[in-house]
């Protein structure tokens, strides 16, 4: 059985023939892999840069991959039948000791005892087939099979938007018509995370800006134009203009210098919120006393955003179906490359390097 294997924390990746069966939880549903998605976390593991990555207990290797689309081959659970398309949930409860884990929300595990498929203590899904627990499988409509792999990263952002809206229920944040149409947001970063959360915010009803340090790529221009998103090059037009405009919501997806966050704080309107998705890779964050005073006086908030769960996968699939209808160009642009798992050269290339303009790269198994 072919699998893509890593040995964290060591760098490197290999295609290996496994003799053992990969089984998760009750393992009552047999799933054959159709395709995997690749994201930055996979590449960090391959390069030995993700310090939290670790194999399952008792061995030194780990099957990579937390984004997957598969087809059910056999099931003893009546909710799933052969031929069903499914996606597995990547973050799962380990001991199930805290209340959040007990009610299916290990994304809020208070004991910090969870596993993450293909990353932390649990084999991933870059493998020909595996046996899984139906609790952690989501059915996928066949009509969106071509873009369904995007549902995993999108699920994290579904939860992010939900969390932002929940925090903002501390006061009345909707407009006088009951919508969010009067609320202005800006997303820093135009990678896959930035593009996807921008699309979600437009779907919810926000006015949306996206910001980067360069002019938009052709693919970004097409997406932002169709979705009604405003692109802003802050290396050309500056950050001070954004501070003077003011935003109800600022989202950082850059994973760049922590110093940018200090500027983003100053862009918040009264009652505004800053969402941080991803981890700064360098720099320091220093806030002057007067900036902190204004932050307090304006009742601003900052929230960390990470990992969706099963309800968010379902929401993501519904939104992908919606986007195929209302934004067909956007939907077609979400998959930027497809690589055959048997093409070793291309496979190693996409597992090690992100391409310019990449949103989602798929590994095709069959």
Swiss-Prot record:
Residue sites binding NADP(+) per the record: 212-214, 277-279, 305-307, 354
Which GO molecular-function terms appear in the entry? D-glucose binding; glucose 1-dehydrogenase (NAD+) activity; glucose 1-dehydrogenase (NADP+) activity; NAD+ binding; NADP+ binding; zinc ion binding
**Top EC class of this enzyme:** oxidoreductase
What residues does Zn(2+) bind to? 39, 66-67, 152
Catalytic activity of the protein: D-glucose + NAD(+) = D-glucono-1,5-lactone + NADH + H(+); D-glucose + NADP(+) = D-glucono-1,5-lactone + NADPH + H(+)
Q: Which UniProt keywords apply?
A: Carbohydrate metabolism, Metal-binding, NAD, NADP, Nucleotide-binding, Oxidoreductase, Zinc
What does the record list as coiled-coil region(s)?
none
- Cited SUPFAM superfamilies: GroES-like, NAD(P)-binding Rossmann-fold domains
One GO BP: protein tetramerization
* Function recorded in the entry: Catalyzes the NAD(P)(+)-dependent oxidation of D-glucose to D-gluconate via gluconolactone. Can utilize both NAD(+) and NADP(+) as electron acceptor. Is involved in the degradation of glucose through a non-phosphorylative variant of the Entner-Doudoroff pathway.
Q: What is this protein called?
A: Glucose 1-dehydrogenase 2
Source organism: Caldivirga maquilingensis (strain ATCC 700844 / DSM 13496 / JCM 10307 / IC-167)
Gene that encodes it: gdh2
């Amino acid at each position: 059985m072919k699998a893509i294997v890593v040995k964290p924390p060591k760098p490197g990746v290999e295609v290996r023939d496994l003799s053992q069966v990969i089984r998760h939880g009750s393992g009552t549903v047999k799933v054959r892999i159709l395709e995997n998605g690749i994201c930055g976390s996979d590449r960090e593991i391959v390069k030995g840069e993700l310090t939290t990555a670790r194999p399952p207990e008792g061995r030194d290797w780990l099957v990579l991959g937390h984004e997957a689309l598969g087809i059910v081959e056999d099931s003893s659970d009546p909710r799933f039948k052969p031929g069903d398309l499914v996606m597995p949930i990547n973050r799962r409860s380990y001991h199930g000791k805290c209340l959040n884990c007990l009610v299916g929300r290990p994304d809020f595990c208070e004991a910090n005892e969870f596993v993450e498929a293909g990353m932390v203590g649990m084999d991933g899904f870059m493998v020909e087939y595996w046996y899984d627990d139906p609790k952690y499988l989501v059915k996928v409509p066949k009509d969106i099979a071509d873009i369904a792999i995007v549902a995993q990263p999108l699920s994290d952002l579904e939860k992010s938007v939900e969390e932002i809206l929940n925090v903002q229920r501390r006061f009345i944040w909707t407009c006088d018509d009951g919508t969010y149409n009067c609320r202005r947001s800006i997303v820093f970063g135009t990678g896959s995370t930035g593009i996807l959360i921008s699309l979600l915010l437009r779907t919810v009803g926000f006015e949306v800006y996206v910001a980067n340090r360069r002019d938009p790529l052709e693919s970004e221009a097409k997406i932002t134009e169709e979705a009604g998103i405003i692109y802003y090059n802050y290396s050309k037009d500056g950050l001070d203009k954004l501070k003077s405009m003011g935003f109800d919501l600022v989202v950082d997806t850059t994973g760049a210098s922590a110093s940018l966050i200090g500027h983003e704080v100053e862009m918040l309107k009264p009652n505004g919120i800053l969402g941080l998705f991803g981890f700064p890779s360098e720099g320091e964050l220093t806030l002057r006393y007067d900036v902190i005073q204004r932050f307090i006086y304006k009742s601003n908030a900052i929230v960390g955003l990470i990992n969706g769960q099963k309800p968010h996968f379902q929401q993501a699939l519904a939104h992908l179906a919606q986007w195929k209808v209302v934004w067909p160009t956007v939907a077609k642009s979400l998959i930027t490359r497809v690589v055959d798992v048997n093409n070793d050269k291309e496979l190693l290339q996409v597992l090690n390097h992100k391409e310019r303009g990449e949103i989602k790269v798929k590994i095709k198994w069959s």
